[in-house]
């Protein structure tokens, strides 16, 4: 019973990145991950079987907020770096 209460995912903390054209950046990131499942309810959520991330624009600043989870810490670090490179390029 106790084991089922343990969260199996590795999470990034919320990471803010300054972006000038947020709609264009989100469109480019969605195109990059074109084989993923998408949800647009709260920003852009990109889902794969073993990892996912959400990008939300700030309501008060030119920032995108990234939250990412993965099955392993290694995968979480790899994908966090990948997504941040796309955001900040």
Where are the regions that the model predicts?
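Phosphate-binding and adjacent anionic-ligand microenvironments
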Residues: 1-67, 72-89
């Amino acid at each position: 019973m106790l084991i089922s209460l343990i969260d199996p995912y590795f999470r990034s903390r919320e990471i803010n990145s300054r972006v000038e054209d947020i709609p264009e950046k989100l469109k480019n990131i969605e195109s990059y991950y074109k084989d993923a499942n998408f949800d647009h309810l709260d920003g852009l959520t990109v889902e794969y079987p073993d990892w996912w991330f959400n990008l939300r624009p700030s309501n008060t600043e030119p920032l995108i907020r990234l939250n990412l989870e993965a099955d392993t810490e290694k995968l979480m670090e790899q994908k966090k770096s990948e997504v941040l490179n796309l955001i900040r390029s």
